Amino acid sequence: ALLFIPGSAPMNLYYSDYEPGIQLYSRHVFIMDKCKDLLPEYLRFVKGLVDSPDLSLNISREMLQQSRNLKVIGKNLEKTILKTLARKAEKERPEYEKFWNEFGKSIKIGIYSGMMTGENNADKLKDLVLFYSARQGRLVTLKEYVEAMKDGQQKIYYAVGKDKESIDALPQTELLKDRDLDVLYLFDPVDEFAIEALHEYD
């Protein structure tokens, strides 16, 4: 497999006319241009190709959807992509933040949609999510927030608003800051759905 993540998100990434998918080959013979069934929807931004000797050259889209080989390939690719992103988040933060600014919404949608469909995406994706920390003045992972919590703090505090100024002005934010508690700022409408879908973080 040869996969990559573009440097910037297409304008129509979250619109119905966007066609995700990976090029599919078998033994170097082209099968399909955009195989949507290979990767989960929340990785719709990933581009590239897969060349597998285990796929039939004469296979319909319906048969592809039922192909065990394709499902195994897809699961392995998903694990590899998530592992790569997790490593970037930990070791190459500036690069990861560039990725997050372009494609972070897809990860958050993946967390929320997983809750709706019964797939447990939260465990796979929770350490990839970044939110703005009021105390640290930067984007942090939930792990980083928890590691910086005060002794005895049991909850993750967050506030929702259209921008930093509007959240700063909330009485609740002021109250938490006065108690020296960190607050995560949620600016994107999907943020609140994602963080509620996570339920808890340990």
Residue ranges and their predicted role:
Residues 1-202:
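Conserved GHKL (Bergerat-fold) ATPase module
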